[in-house]
Amino acid sequence: MKQVYIIGMGPGSRKCLTQQASEAIEHADVIIGSKRLLEAYSNTDKKLFYAVTARDIYDIINKEKALIYAVLMSGDTGFYSGTKKLTEQLYKAQEESGEKKYDINILPGISSVIYLASKIGQPWEMAAMVSLHGKKQNYIPLVLTNEWTYFLTQGDVSHICKRLCESGLGGADIWIGENLSYDNEKILSGHVSEYSEYTAAGLTVMAVNNHYPQAAVMTGLPDESFIRADIPMTKREIRASVVSRLSPAKDAIVYDIGAGTGSVSVELAMHALYGTVYAVERTKEGCELIAQNARKFGLDNIDIINASAADVIDKLPAADSVFIGGSGGELEKIMDIVLKKNPGVHIVITAVTLETLNDSVRLMEDKKVDVIDIVQIAVTQIKKRGRYHMLAANNPVFIIEGRGNR
């Protein structure tokens, strides 16, 4: 049986290795890792292999005849690490072979985030974590709603700080750690606005302290929060009901069809922070407003599509949830596509006419969609006119909610 040690190497310097990790590397016949992590062992007589993907690492372990392997992972093995994919690959191979081929040992390390937190004397247990290593993440809402946010970056500090400044966070405190644990370690501090033009090293960790965090997720934002023109907008009370009914998961794929100004897209995107909201709108003016509102609320997870929904949604990833605020007369075609892509999709439709209400219910029943609820919401606002307070009624809106049968 081959022994496989998956080792968290900490921020980089061998001084930060645990004794257990050092002993495992010392006893290993083969060391596997990235070029940066292998540099420290260039003078050893052990076999060194450069590999970073789970598949490549597994292939080396599978083909080599050695018995003890040290797989080096940057930081900690449980924090944005390749450990999960590698262990899945190894266990899958064992299951397929029907024999226990590997004795897998995971040895944790000191994450660079924890290292920076200790250097600046701040706790990290309640902080939000953002990794921008080779992927996109919607971080503005996290910084807005958390007192502390830590970033693993690829050196794009200036871009991040510019985005934070655009969202009103230029006055937040920031710490920037470069080459942590190495001899050329550097830690800078100040306000976010001071680093919007800063060129950082490749291996950079940031801590941002927002002294005035907002409530985590708001549903039913005031209508005046949004940039508007002459494009119809789903009003606050209706929007709150729609979003609460859909309640998308953090990593959900959501369609907002007939997105208008993007008010519903914005609130859905606040819930699906790690997912994507596809805002489909036929008018160019509407798409421009959606983009403006997405920027205003610091949301990177809204994908704006200027087209008729029936022409484009078949090319999108299958949706978990769909809001149809306007179908352009193609409701049946839209429903056919979303149900084909995901038979269990969650659908909410709004209607202001009896004809659209009738079509929505009939189509759901014809297509074996479970009709969960049908409600009518009639909102009357009280507005002051001189010395008097007058009732101003909005058009009643029907909300039809259904879920497909898998």
Regions found by a protein language model. Give the residues of each.
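Conserved SAM-binding loop of SAM-dependent methyltransferases across substrates and taxa
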Residues: 261-273
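Class I SAM-dependent methyltransferase SAM-binding "motif I" and its flanking Rossmann-like core
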Residues: 12-13, 19, 75-145, 310-311, ...
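Conserved SAM-binding loop
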Residues: 290-291
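A contiguous loop/helix-start segment that scaffolds small-molecule binding in enzyme catalytic cores
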Residues: 2-6, 19-20, 51, 69, ...
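Class I S-adenosyl-L-methionine
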Residues: 1-105, 114, 274-277, 281, ...
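Conserved S-adenosyl-L-methionine
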Residues: 270-277, 341-343
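Conserved class I S-adenosyl-L-methionine
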Residues: 251-260
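C-terminal substrate-binding/active-site "lid" region of AdoMet-derived donor-dependent transferases
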Residues: 339-393
